[in-house]
Each structure stands twice: as structure tokens, then as C-alpha cells.
Amino acid sequence: MLYSIFIFLLAGLCEIGGGYLIWLWLREGQSSWLGFIGGVILMMYGVIATFQSFPTFGRVYAAYGGVFIVMSLIWAYIVDKQAPDKYDLIGACICIIGVCVMILPSRT
């Protein structure tokens, strides 16, 4: 279980970080090198997600989606200095509950 959490967190950092670098390039007019580096990091995200131990693509990405939402809010708070409001927090909690429902039960 700790391995799965680690992979989710690493994938999230790559997806959010890579996307953020592309955002800086295209939306804020920063260097195209940031866009290139962001693209490479996003490719790493695609590879890292395959290290999950879950047997199916759909379940991995569905569960990861909830983790991505929470990590995006944390990123917004730390990097963009934008605190989540109560609706953001309620929505994130609902997502994490959904992730737990998907990944915690043992399946045969």
C-alpha cells in the first residue's frame, strides 16, 4: 500500500509540475525551455503511472484522479499562494473517500 501511495504522489508531482511549467511558458510568456522541460516531465508521469500494482489501467487512473485533485489544491496553496475554500476541501474529501472505496477492498 505504501508503494502505491508513493507512486501516486510521484506521478502527481510529475503531472502537476510538468503542466505548471507548460502553463508558465504559454500563459505567462516565460522561456520555451520551461515548456520543453514540462513536456519531458509529463512524459515521465505517463511512465511512472505504469509502475502501479493495480491490474487495470482504468482503475489506476480513476483512483489517481482523486489524488491528483488533492495534490492540485496543495500545489495551489504552496506555489500559487491560493488557499482552498471550504467547497474545495469538501470536494477533495469526497474524492479521497471515492479513491479509498476503489482501492482498499481486496479483489480476486
Curated annotation (Swiss-Prot):
Would the keyword Transmembrane be found if you checked this record's keyword annotation?
yes
Concerning InterPro entries, the annotation shows: UPF0060
Q: How does it sit in the membrane?
A: Multi-pass membrane protein
Record keywords, A-Z: Cell membrane, Membrane, Transmembrane, Transmembrane helix
Superkingdom to which the source organism belongs: Bacteria
Using the UniProt record, give the first listed, main subcellular location: membrane
Can you cite an annotated GO cellular component? Answer: plasma membrane
Cellular localisation: Cell membrane
Residue ranges spanning the membrane: these are 5-25, 31-51, 60-80, 86-106
NCBIfam families from the entry? PRK02237.1 (NF002586)
Q: Which family does the record claim for this protein?
A: Belongs to the UPF0060 family.
Q: Tell me the protein's name.
A: UPF0060 membrane protein SH0717
